[in-house]
Design a protein with these regions (language model features):
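A glycine-/small-polar-enriched, mobile loop at the entrance of the PLP active site in fold-type I
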Residues: 13
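Beta1-alpha1 glycine-rich phosphate/pyrophosphate-binding loop at the start
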Residues: 1-10, 32, 36-40, 71-139, ...
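FAD-binding core/adjacent interface of flavoenzyme oxidoreductases
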Residues: 16, 22-72, 88, 131-171
């Protein structure tokens, strides 16, 4: 039941549980009299146990809509959109410019913060649900916007920021 509750509002609790800095723990009013609720550790423990016990399995849609959706970008936002759309019965193709799926989760988060095996487990689940992944596809270069519009019923743009940008704040 705990795993189901986590997944009801969060596609990827194994990512957020490891990566969130947990500011809520510092603000927890319970901390006035005793240690605050360690929600970050609770979340990680629940989802890790759920994977170990085999409680997290592919959720294959019972009915297909016949509609196709392109998702451009395979970072956390693109993956969450893809999983929800696939589970709703749409044919989903995720396009990724890089050679591997995951965006920031794959290339921006160091292994000591989140082992890539957690990402790979989730990607395998998504593939088993019916999500298709296409890597090495730079939309706008290898595939035009017109092709996406012509070939898909909807397009989700979930591209990440590949270059940093300084804020123009003096001092």
């Amino acid at each position: 039941e705990a795993s189901d509750r986590l997944h009801a509002t969060n596609n990827f609790p194994e990512f957020t549980g490891r990566l969130c800095p947990a500011p809520c723990e510092g603000a927890c009013v319970l901390g006035i009299n005793e240690p605050p609720v360690t929600i970050k550790q609770v979340e990680v423990s629940i989802v890790d146990r759920a994977w170990q016990e085999g409680w997290i399995t592919p959720v294959v849609p019972q009915e297909l809509t016949g509609r196709r959706v392109a998702v451009v970008g395979s970072g956390p936002a693109g993956l969450a959109a893809a999983q929800q759309l696939t589970r709703a019965g749409h044919g989903v193709v995720v396009f990724e410019r890089a050679d591997r799926i995951g965006g920031l989760l794959r290339y921006g988060i160091p292994e000591f913060k989140m082992e890539k095996r957690h990402l790979d487990l989730r990607l395998a689940q998504m593939e088993a649900e019916g999500t298709e992944f296409r890597t090495n596809t730079d939309v706008g270069v290898d595939l035009t916007a017109r092709e996406l519009i012509d070939d898909f019923d909807a397009v989700v743009l979930a591209g990440g920021a590949t270059q940093s940008r300084d804020l123009p704040i003096p001092g």
